[in-house]
Amino acid sequence: KILVADMSSDILSQPIDVTQYGLIFAGVQKNIGPAGTVIVIIREDLITDDVLNGTPTMLKYKIHSDNNSLYNTPPAYGIYICGKVFKYLKKLGGLEVMKVRNEEKAKILYDYLDSSKLFNGTVVKEDRSLMNVPFITGNKELDDKFIKEAKKVGIENIRGHRTVGGMRASIYNAMPIEGVKYLVEFMKKFEEENK
């Protein structure tokens, strides 16, 4: 069996054992760099010419491997920014430090959601993400009011995914703990005003 993972949302948020995967891919735009750059980590035994007919050249990893990842013009600026982020994370203490920071941020938000009488998290505890925290009020009109009022106080892009609705706090590596605390304080105020 081969495990393939899309780690676009959580790559570099905590240490991972890459040996447990056949292939990891991640758009870097959430935790590493600008949109348009992708990281692929693939197990060597999966780098072969044996691909399905019609597979686009960009997905034929043997071509990339044989050309030292330079088969086409690389996104130089994106790679440059990613390199800066890698150095920054290393300087901070690496992924163990990021994991602790991200767990601390997520705990603040999940603890509030677990105690709130208005807001409810939508993911069971054992499956909760450190990066994306979806929640609802249970009332679409109230969700819309929350989103509108949040925008007025500088909380942007809190609307949930279009297929799920509600709200979603994306607390990626770059989000400081102060940002999460600010969100929770706003949520408490909103809850008090909308009992």
Model-derived segments and their meaning:
Residues 152, 165-195:
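PLP-dependent enzyme catalytic core of the Aspartate aminotransferase-like
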Residues 119-150:
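Conserved PLP-binding catalytic core of the aspartate aminotransferase-like
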Residues 1-19:
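Catalytic PLP-binding core of fold-type I/II PLP enzymes
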